[in-house]
Amino acid sequence: MSREEVESLIQEVLEVYPEKARKDRAKHLSPNDPALEQSKKCITSNKKSQPGLMTIRGCAYAGSKGVVWGPIKDMIHISHGPVGCGQSSRAGRGNYYIGTTGVNAFVTMNFTSDFQEKDIVFGGDKKLAKLIDEIETLFPLKKGISVQSECPIGLIGDDIEAVAKKKAAEHETTVVPVRCEGFRGVSQSLGHHIANDAIRDWVLDKRDDDTSFETTPYDVSIIGDYNIGGDAWSSRILLEEMGLRVVATWSGDGTISQMELTPKVKLNLVHCYRSMNYISRHMEEKYGIPLMEYNFFGPTKTAESLRAIAEHFDDSIKAKCEQVIAKYQSEWEAVIAKYRPSLEGKRVMLYVGGLLPRHVIGAYKDLGIELVGTGYGFGHNDDYDRTLKEMGNATLLYDDVTGYEFEEFVKRINPDLIGSGIKEKYIFQKMGIPFRQMHSWDYSGPYHGFDVAIFARNMDMTLNNPCWKKLQAPWEKAEESAEKVAASA
């Protein structure tokens, strides 16, 4: 589509809104301009959603517990409030981990204070204290506790910090209070920030004076990889094959001990910039640890990132980097040769969180799939700054897109594939459009590194599945047949 066509499409879709809402939403929709250095000149982001519009965003609690803290496997994360929030954020993303669930790993379990009406009236501090005591008795191998506040906790003013300090001293364990009530901020993005700040204040400096850990010149951490489908494991294999030592993964398959040791590494490798840039910036300022954003989606971007990482180290690492790329090159070239012919020329629209709308573009390009629209649910303008240059001219950009807008854009652009979240999945599948869930890889994966065969296979089996040709209702077929008979008469 040309720039004029995209601008016309945006105006058509916005016509149904009242004038005030139409003017506000127009700021969040734009054709892409790769020449721009600052995205704020074309699109507005990280603003409060308009009341009455069906936003697809999540809340601060989801950003903290569901994204940052939840995958830390050897801690118990208490969802402090009514039971529903904890249950809805439990085991939904496929954060893989090594350990025995319920013994020394707790990622897929739901620990809740199960707030009731009486707790709202009388407060929940005593209940929280009792819950921590029970955890100490029942789960002796856990290494720490986090308290993830839900909305009622902030509304009634419970002092979870005081409870955390008291119980941490009493049980000689780490107890981290996280003020991530869902009403805070405009999206789950503030939950990421709050979670990062809680790690900074309650965890990160615990081993600053500990000299027992032997460091090497090749120590790195993987930050912002949540090990969905085993992503962090695939990334770790490549980094270790090129001679680096991965000290910590944040937070997929991660531990509290790894987090405490991270200030001792030489380089922080940041995959999901949006959710983990805050703690990475803090470590850069306090400990002098440089951070580097990298992209392990698709073989082209993976090879580029490996070479960029190697530039931070000596010639031995650079040489091993080239050996690693050469080792896997024939494999990924064979995969692309197999799948690209059936995917070439297909078009995809994306709407995800704060990373994937730009990071997966290269993976689709490797397979010959064209991006025709993308947007962030909780991205900031620095995310869009990085996105503009990855996309073609006049590609449709949409920020905090509403359910109505997304459906209308899809109807008019008619993409071959949509990549978004679980809330959108069934709407578009019922419209007969192939869909991939890009928050959990539809419980597949890994997608990171040179495991390109899994990504390619999933796109191929979705796009070229014969079921899409069988979705026409019988009465619609009858109408078509009648029209053909009438036309031939």
UniProtKB/Swiss-Prot annotation:
Under SUPFAM superfamilies, the record lists:
Helical backbone' metal receptor
Task: Give the E.C. number(s).
Answer: 1.18.6.1
For the ligand ([7Fe-Mo-9S-C-homocitryl] cluster), the binding residues are: C272, H439
Q: How is the cofactor bound?
A: Binds 1 [8Fe-7S] cluster per heterodimer.
Q: Where is this region: Disordered?
A: 21-44
Q: Which domain of life is it from?
A: Bacteria
One GO CC term on file: molybdenum-iron nitrogenase complex
CDD domains reported for this sequence: Nitrogenase_MoFe_alpha (cd01976)
Q: Which InterPro entries match?
A: Nase/OxRdtase_comp1 (IPR000510), Nase_comp1_asu (IPR010143), Nase_comp1_CS (IPR000318), Nase_Mo-Fe_asu (IPR005972)
Binding of [8Fe-7S] cluster, residues: C59, C85, C151
The question of whether tRNA-binding is a record keyword is answered with no
Q: Which UniProt keywords apply?
A: ATP-binding, Iron, Iron-sulfur, Metal-binding, Molybdenum, Nitrogen fixation, Nucleotide-binding, Oxidoreductase
Tell whether Lyase is among the UniProt keywords.
Answer: no
Question: For this chain's UniProt record, which GO biological process terms are given?
Answer: nitrogen fixation
Which molecular function GO terms apply here? ATP binding; iron-sulfur cluster binding; metal ion binding; nitrogenase activity
Its recorded reaction(s) are: N2 + 8 reduced [2Fe-2S]-[ferredoxin] + 16 ATP + 16 H2O = H2 + 8 oxidized [2Fe-2S]-[ferredoxin] + 2 NH4(+) + 16 ADP + 16 phosphate + 6 H(+)
Family that this chain belongs to:
Belongs to the NifD/NifK/NifE/NifN family.
* Job of this protein: This molybdenum-iron protein is part of the nitrogenase complex that catalyzes the key enzymatic reactions in nitrogen fixation.
Q: How does it assemble?
A: Tetramer of two alpha and two beta chains. Forms complex with the iron protein (nitrogenase component 2).
Instruction: Write the protein's name.
Output: Nitrogenase molybdenum-iron protein alpha chain
Which organism is this entry from? Alcaligenes faecalis
Lineage in the entry? Answer: Bacteria, Pseudomonadati, Pseudomonadota, Betaproteobacteria, Burkholderiales
